[in-house]
Amino acid sequence: AQGPHRDQFVERFHREARSAAAIANPHIVQVYDTGEFDGLDYLVMEYVHGVNLRYEMNQQGTFSVRETLRIIGETLDGLASAHRAGVVHRDIKPENILLNDRGHVQITDFGLAKTVSQATLSSTGILLGTAAYLAPEMIEKNQATPQGDLYSVGIMAWEMLAGNVPFTSDNPVTLVFKHVHEDVPSIATACKGINEGVAAFLAHLTARAVEARPADASVALTELQRLQSTLAVSDWQYRLPPVDVSASDSAAPANNGAPTNVGNPVPPAPPAPPTQQFDDRTRKLDRVKTNATTVMPVQQQN
């Protein structure tokens, strides 16, 4: 890491290692070690063979309720372990949700994570995270909370079902203004006929007031499991016909450099007891073990 913000970058880098290493969960990319060699900071972490959720979104356009809730459920399971350890991710977005070659979620990039007890980072003057998924309290007060992670998860689920995020703008200032001053519209406005319970669950995650959301990911996961037990087959199968991929690509937030292994995407496995075969049209990834290690040198982004 070089440049005027080197010390701040290095601190964030080592914080990522400490945060991720403290959490043991199959839905979080495992960090094994960190250090410095010849002036180069490095991170030793689990190698995940697969794609990120953004890649899968670009391929599919929209997701069924079944696919969406399974991915969201595994994301909440990983975040529940983080929240129990006192760690908030701060930057949940599709680029940071990896789908391994079995189709399961592994959350990555805890570089923006911070323990709840740490001082706010507002003094740095840097707005961390991605505007399309930022919770109102992060924008207004740089306040990192478990509920902020849930807001981001809810926006991500909204995008998976509808094919686009609820708030869009070419101007990031306008975008964050909407998150602070407008309620996230019901997913039912974009997905006519979707189950009312699914819409209510997303509304709970994306409530504008932090106290109106579930207390943490564990509470949200319990709520999701209750919802899943009430869904009929037709509710699970609901899917909005995907829009033209070339048009949706321009509206979706760009991949900001999160690690991605480019290959054919892997559709998620069904969450409910009735099983179904994976769709062969997208399952052609070469198989490698995901418990291999990767030594990743880290350079400061300019």
Can you annotate each of these PLM segments?
Residues 34:
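Activation-segment/catalytic-loop signature of the eukaryotic protein kinase fold
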Residues 75-87:
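Protein kinase catalytic-loop region centered on the HRD/HxD motif
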Residues 1-22:
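AlphaC helix of the eukaryotic protein kinase fold
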Residues 71-72:
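Activation segment signature within eukaryotic-like protein kinase domains
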Residues 132-235:
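C-terminal lobe helix-coil module of Hanks-type protein kinase domains
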Residues 211-293:
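Juxtacatalytic C-terminal regulatory tail of Ser/Thr protein kinases
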Residues 38-52, 56:
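Conserved short submotifs of the Hanks-type protein kinase catalytic core
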